[in-house]
C-alpha cells in the first residue's frame, strides 16, 4: 500500500479523517484504503495534576494509504470540504511518503493509531526500554525528561526530521540496601 499526506486545517484532522472514511466507504467500498491521523500519548500538567492526553503526531496532516490515489482524489475533489487545504504533490503527481518513514510510524502506533507509553529504565546515561512501542526503536530517542515523563524522539516525515515528545514511564532499579531498610506492615 502506498501512503500519501493530505494537508488540512489545524484541529480538524479527526473530522476530515471521519468524513473521508465515510465518502470512500460509500463511493468505493471494494477498494483497499486506510485513512488515519496518528496520535501520541503525552503527560501534561494542569492545575498541579498530571494528566495523560492525546495529541496529534503531525498537526494539519491526514495520512491516506491506498493503491488508487487518483480515484480517491476524485472522490475528495467532488465532495469539497472547507477543512481540506490540499493534497501534497511532487511536481505534477501526488507526493508519496517514503516507505521507510511510514513503516516506522505504523510500527510505533497501536490499533487506535496512538503511540502509547513505553517503560524505560535509565541507568548512568544508558536507556533500556523494557516494553512499549519504542522497544525496537532505541535509536530514535534523543532526550529523556524523567521529571515530566517524556521522551523526545526523532521521526522522519515527508523527508524532514521531526522531533516530538511522547509519554514514557521511568522505572527505577532498587538496590538491596534500600529494600532491606523498608518497613513492612502486617
Task: Please place each PLM-identified region on the residue numbering.
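Acidic-enriched and Gly/Ser
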Residues: 1-126, 152-186
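Short coil-to-beta-strand transition motifs
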Residues: 2, 130-138
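Short, conserved beta-turn/loop elements at beta-strand boundaries and strand-helix junctions
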Residues: 132-134, 144-149
Amino acid at each position: 500500500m502506498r501512503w500519501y499526506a493530505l494537508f488540512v486545517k489545524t484541529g480538524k484532522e479527526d473530522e476530515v479523517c471521519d468524513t473521508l472514511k465515510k465518502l470512500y466507504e460509500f463511493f468505493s467500498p471494494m477498494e483497499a484504503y486506510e485513512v488515519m491521523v496518528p496520535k501520541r500519548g503525552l503527560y501534561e500538567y494542569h492545575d498541579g495534576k498530571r494528566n495523560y492526553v492525546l495529541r496529534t503526531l503531525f498537526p494539519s496532516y491526514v495520512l491516506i494509504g491506498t493503491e488508487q490515489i487518483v480515484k480517491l482524489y476524485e472522490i475528495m475533489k467532488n465532495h469539497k470540504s472547507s477543512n481540506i487545504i490540499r493534497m501534497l504533490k511532487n511536481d505534477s503527481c501526488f507526493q508519496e511518503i517514503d516507505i521507510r518513514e511510514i513503516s516506522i510510524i505504523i510500527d510505533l502506533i497501536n490499533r487506535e493509531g496512538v503511540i502509547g507509553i513505553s517503560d524505560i529504565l535509565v541507568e548512568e546515561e544508558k536507556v533500556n526500554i523494557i516494553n512499549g512501542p519504542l522497544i525496537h526503536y532505541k535509536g530514535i530517542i534523543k532526550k529523556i525528561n524523567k521529571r515530566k515523563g517524556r521522551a523526545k524522539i526523532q521521526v522522519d516525515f515527508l523527508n524532514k526530521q521531526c522531533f516530538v515528545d511522547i509519554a514514557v514511564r521511568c522505572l527505577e532499579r532498587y538496590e538491596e540496601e534500600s529494600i532491606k531498610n523498608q518497613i513492612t506492615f502486617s
